[in-house]
Design a protein with these regions (language model features):
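Extracytoplasmic gate region of multi-pass secondary transporters
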Residues: 30-31, 236-285, 322-323, 355-359, ...
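Extracellular/periplasmic helix-loop-helix junction of adjacent transmembrane segments
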Residues: 34-67
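C-terminal ends and interior cores of transmembrane alpha-helices
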Residues: 43, 90-109, 313-337, 382-388
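Central cavity-lining transmembrane alpha-helices of secondary-active solute carriers
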Residues: 55-74, 93-95, 160, 282-295
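Cytoplasmic membrane-interface "Motif A"-like loop-to-helix N-cap segments
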Residues: 78-90, 301-312
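Glycine-rich segments within core transmembrane alpha-helices of 12-TM secondary carriers
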Residues: 126, 148-173, 196, 322, ...
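Multi-pass alpha-helical transporter architecture, strongest
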Residues: 200-207, 318-329, 472-497
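Low-complexity, proline/glycine-enriched hydrophobic segments characteristic of transmembrane helices
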Residues: 321-398, 458-461
Length: 497
């Protein structure tokens, strides 16, 4: 590859990656603020139900992603890659900004969660069209034999988008008081996205169409009905189903377990301080992100199949030991409380409620803050926040990093794997659907399903209740591993590119 072509593809990578990263930021800022959002847009009389409702709304955005894949995939195979993922960028950015403008449940009642749900669905539709367009656009610019390496840069954007969402939240919290952030500051990360979208739109606007698609359009070989050709043709449908059940289904649950469920688990099951979770997760993501490129590059050398399959296998075998070790870092029953009276304060609120805060310290440096809110004619609401020690923080960073490493193994090569399975004229449509079903349905529902399993097991009195949420990703990844090992060919198919 010449110097000019190297410069050209870096321009393509930059434009595609920046836009896709912003869309992931927009999509995941909702999940990163799920604990706060549950208190703003849903009834506050049952915090657990409100949090589960927030996760369900978060999951709704994933459920519609396949529909976005079909709509925008068809559009991308007919009018082109460039203009399609420009449209998805604007739809995502506008929806995210408006979520930050919705009045609270206390102000407009059930209209608040309804508006959030509608905008969340629009976010899901937009993301359903974005990833396939960006991955296809980059792959169709990349030279033969290097598609794993170049498309792996797109694979970093989901993790980088999550990382930036955490950093924006931390930055906002650092300049505002806890009261101000809880009152209105949580809206700032949603508003910030509109500026980033504007910059990315201008960059994408000046990009050329994919040379492979432009050539096909000039020769008149583009599809007039990509949906029919993708799913009505038994030969193509076979590869769509193989991509889903032999790759993206397992990749989806590994991705969301290693990043989003890990975050949710630390905040809601382990009760680690929210800012500490954002910080340690951000560090683990920062350390792990380069491995997307490593495994994408390696897949060009040895094939995609075994890297992805072994990533799933390692995750299946390791999840329960990893999460048991995570839980034990904040298990108060294994720590020694300092023998002195806990600090106790009570604060009266203007609405007639009162908040009692009890602070306990332990010999290893752990601090536990327990807040009891006494509402008039309502049950007592209890929340616990644990400030972990530096040693425990680095232990958790390591345990999350291991999970991120599994993510990079299954996710780094998958864009190249998918685009190589389908011909140019139906590529956008054919690769988008299995990707977004695997990630949107199987992966996106994971936080809500796993949290429900944990909550149910805890209510049932199981000693290791906190591990029950892992059965879902273990089973799904296990099924995918078996199908992938049997039916996927390790030879990278490049005949379509």
């Amino acid at each position: 590859m010449s110097k000019t072509s190297t410069k050209g593809i870096w321009k393509v990578i930059s434009a595609s990656s920046m836009g896709t990263m912003i869309e992931w930021y927009d999509f995941y800022i909702f999940g990163s603020l799920a604990v706060v959002i549950s208190t703003k847009f849903f009834p506050s009389d049952n915090p657990t139900a409100a949090f589960l409702s927030t996760l369900a709304t978060f999951a709704a955005g994933f459920v519609v992603r396949p529909f976005g894949a079909l709509f925008f995939g068809r559009l991308g195979d007919i009018i082109g890659r460039k203009y399609t993922f420009m449209a998805t960028l604007l739809l995502m950015g506008g929806s995210t900004f408006l979520i930050g403008c919705i009045p609270s449940y206390e102000s407009i009642g059930f209209l608040a969660p309804l508006l959030v749900l509608i905008l969340r669905l629009l976010q899901g539709l937009a993301l359903g069209g974005e990833y396939g367009g960006a991955a296809t656009y980059v792959a169709e610019h990349a030279p033969a034999g290097e598609k794993g390496y170049w498309t792996s840069w797109i694979q970093t954007t989901a993790t980088v988008g999550l990382f930036i969402s955490l950093m924006v939240i931390l930055a906002t919290k650092s300049v505002l008081s806890p009261e101000a952030f809880d009152l209105w500051g949580w809206r700032v990360p949603f508003w910030v996205s509109i500026a980033m979208v504007g910059v990315s739109y201008l960059i994408r606007k000046n990009m050329d169409e994919s040379p492979v698609f432009a050539k096909a359009k000039k020769e008149g070989t583009t599809s007039t009905n990509p949906l029919k050709e993708s799913f009505g043709n038994r030969y193509n449908l076979k590869f769509v189903l193989l991509a889903l059940f032999g790759a993206t289904m397992g990749q989806g649950v590994v991705w969301y377990t290693g990043q989003f469920y890990a975050m949710s688990f630390m905040k809601t099951v382990m009760n680690v301080d929210s800012s500490q979770v954002d910080e340690l997760l951000g560090i683990a993501l920062l350390i792990g992100t380069p491995f997307f490129i490593v495994f994408g590059w390696l897949s060009d050398k040895i094939g995609r199949k075994y890297i992805m399959m072994f990533g799933m296998l390692f995750a299946i075998l390791s999840y329960r030991p990893i999460y048991k070790a995570m839980y034990n870092t904040t298990d108060i029953s294994q720590k020694i409380e300092i023998a002195e009276n806990p600090r106790k304060t009570t604060e009266k609120k203007a609405d007639g409620s009162s908040v009692t805060t009890i602070q306990k310290k332990y010999t290893d440096g752990t601090t536990v803050m327990e807040k009891k809110t006494y509402m008039e004619k309502k049950d007592v609401q209890t929340s616990v926040s644990i400030q972990i020690t530096p040693n425990d923080k680095w232990a958790l960073i390591f345990l999350v990093f291991i999970q991120v490493l599994f993510v990079t193994m299954v996710y780094g090569p998958i864009a190249a794997f998918l685009v190589e399975m389908f011909p140019t004229k139906i590529r956008y449509t054919s690769m988008s659907l299995p990707y977004h079903v695997g990630n949107g349905i199987f992966g996106g529902l994971l936080p809500a399903i796993s949290t429900y399993f944990v909550s149910h097991a805890k209510t049932a009195g199981k000693a290791d209740f906190y591990l029950d949420g892992l059965w879902y990703p273990i089973i799904i990844a296990g099924i995918c591993f078996v199908i992938g090992m049997i039916y996927i060919d390790n030879k990278n198919k490049i005949t379509h590119l």
